[in-house]
Curated annotation (Swiss-Prot):
Organism of provenance: Arabidopsis thaliana
Stated family: Belongs to the RuBisCO activase family.
Positions carrying Phosphothreonine: 78, 283
Sequence positions that bind ATP: 165-172
Transit peptide location on this chain: 1-58
Name by which UniProt lists this protein: Ribulose bisphosphate carboxylase/oxygenase activase, chloroplastic
Disulfide linkage: none
Keywords, sorted A to Z: ATP-binding, Chloroplast, Nucleotide-binding, Phosphoprotein, Plastid, Transit peptide
One term under GO cellular component: chloroplast envelope
InterPro entries xrefs: ATPase_AAA_core, P-loop_NTPase, RCA-like, RuBisCO_activase_AAA_helical
Lineage, broadest ranks: Eukaryota, Viridiplantae, Streptophyta, Embryophyta, Tracheophyta
MF GO annotations: ADP binding; ATP binding; ATP hydrolysis activity; enzyme regulator activity; mRNA binding; ribulose-1,5-bisphosphate carboxylase/oxygenase activator activity
GO biological process entries: leaf senescence; response to cold; response to jasmonic acid; response to light stimulus
Subcellular location per the Swiss-Prot or TrEMBL entry: Plastid, Chloroplast stroma; Plastid, Chloroplast, Plastoglobule
């Protein structure tokens, strides 16, 4: 204990020289409590000398700040330093903090926003502007487009994706939704552009459109070539269609592009510089009508699109999203028409507006429709959204189905060739009792009834409908 006391008492009591009273820097007292490290104190640490400089406050003119200022980005800095300034506000002495809201001390993001954006998780959302995208459709299209922009080792990726299926199932519209969600502005082509009066023009057009898309990709914008209804323009629909040289050249051009996607040349020129690879998306109803070597697996990846019940319900919810129809009514409506295409429900919704249009025509007059709609100083007419109910949709849906049945049942072309009669053209109207005694007018005009037989004694020449009252004198 004595040794400990003597050690504690052995403190260097040399006077500490400050303010220039000693020579140089001196050592601070050291003890076992402070350790053996020597701490040097500057001789000018507490100088009473005052500065002769003046303090100036300057205002920066915003109009003189240029876009080329090397420090202008600091005002929008969202690094961790800026967040620390925000978090430390109110927790640190104000002496050590710069005023908030001045230049770089203004944090653009709050701490919560910064953390939430940093930890944000992205998922494959299958909605675009309120419209439903089928997950299987979106998966196939996104994977195909992405795969064509990647460099996969020792793998030959098919350039063309052929989406085919029944009519009116939303193939083209679903493609547009997926591309819009991916930020792609595609180069569009239709089946009508695959035929021309000049031999070779459609094949040249395909190469031009492909190179246009390649130029956009070269500029840093994702793009693709989208061909609508390929089978209608390049396929053979039976003996009634003629196979022309343009059909042959379109098939050959697509085959050549699929084999050499980075070396697509225009007729009459050759450029050694390679172009960007552009994925091609094709839609159609029946790809069995296309040239078989074109649709082989190495060139075209095929996808048969048949929407499930969930897909049909999801698309119909997007169609009727602004009509305040209950979800259970939409499900029932879809189940009531299981064999109809998705396009049927879009036509059904448009059919409900017929009543509003009819009221507009009656209020304006048939003679004034042209001046009101085509050459009018007034704006376009505004219609109130009609009330849509399940009962009204079912009524119009049954009417559309009846028209479809008429087309399949009557087949007037064959009837005209076989006989000089109308066949069963009016069978549906006769069965409903709406054929006799009524004309084709849209308004209820009185039809005079009476005896229409000239041989009868009570023949009425003004009668337009026979009521069965003819009297004969034998």
């Amino acid at each position: 204990m004595a040794a400990a006391v003597s050690t504690v008492g052995a403190i260097n009591r040399a006077p500490l020289s400050l303010n220039g009273s000693g020579s140089g820097a001196v050592s601070a007292p050291a003890s076992t409590f402070l350790g053996k490290k020597v701490v040097t104190v500057s001789r000018f640490a507490q100088s009473n000398k005052k500065s002769n400089g003046s303090f100036k406050v300057l205002a920066v003119k915003e109009d003189k700040q240029t876009d080329g200022d090397r420090w202008r980005g600091l005002a929008y800095d969202t690094s961790d330093d800026q967040q620390d300034i925000t978090r430390g506000k109110g927790m640190v002495d104000s002496v050590f903090q710069a005023p908030m809201g001045t230049g770089t001390h203004h944090a653009v993001l709050s701490s919560y926003e910064y953390v939430s954006q940093g930890l944000r998780q992205y998922n494959l959302d299958n909605m675009m502007d309120g419209f439903y995208i089928a997950p299987a459709f979106m998966d196939k299209l996104v994977v195909h487009i992405t795969k064509n922009f990647l460099t996969l080792p020792n793998i030959k990726v098919p350039l063309i994706l052929g989406i085919w299926g029944g009519k009116g199932q939303g193939k083209s519209f679903q493609c547009e939704l997926v591309m819009a969600k991916m930020g792609i502005n595609p180069i569009m082509m239709s089946a009508g552009e695959l035929e021309s009066g000049n031999a070779g023009e459609p094949a040249k057009l395909i190469r031009q459109r492909y190179r246009e898309a390649a130029d956009l990709i070269k500029k840093g914008k994702m793009c693709c070539l989208f061909i609508n209804d390929l089978d209608a323009g390049a396929g053979r629909m039976g003996g009634t269609t003629q196979y022309t040289v343009n059909n042959q050249m379109v098939n050959a051009t697509l085959m050549n592009i699929a084999d050499n996607p980075t070396n697509v040349q225009l007729p009459g020129m050759y450029n050694k510089e390679e172009n960007a690879r552009v994925p091609i998306i094709c839609t159609g109803n029946d790809f069995s009508t296309l040239y078989a070597p074109l649709i082989r697996d190495g060139r075209m990846e095929k996808f048969y699109w048949a929407p499930t019940r969930e897909d049909r319900i999801g698309v119909c919810k997007g169609i009727f999203r602004t009509d305040k129809i209950k979800d259970e009514d939409i499900v029932t409506l879809v189940d009531q028409f299981p064999g109809q295409s998705i396009d049927f429900f879009g036509a059904l919704r448009a059919r409900v507006y017929d009543d509003e249009v009819r009221k507009f025509v009656e209020s304006l007059g048939v003679e004034k429709i042209g001046k009101r709609l085509v050459n009018s100083r007034e704006g376009p007419p505004v219609f109130e959204q009609p009330e849509m109910t399940y009962e009204k949709l079912m009524e119009y849906g049954n009417m559309l189905v009846m028209e479809q049945e008429n087309v399949k049942r009557v087949q007037l072309a064959e009837t005209y060739l076989s006989q000089a009669a109308l066949g069963d053209a009016n069978a549906d109207a006769i069965g409903r009792g709406t054929f006799y005694g009524k004309g084709a007018q849209q308004v209820n005009l009185p039809v005079p009834e009476g005896c229409t037989d000239p041989v009868a004694e009570n023949f009425d020449p003004t009668a337009r409908s026979d009521d069965g009252t003819c009297v004969y004198n034998f």
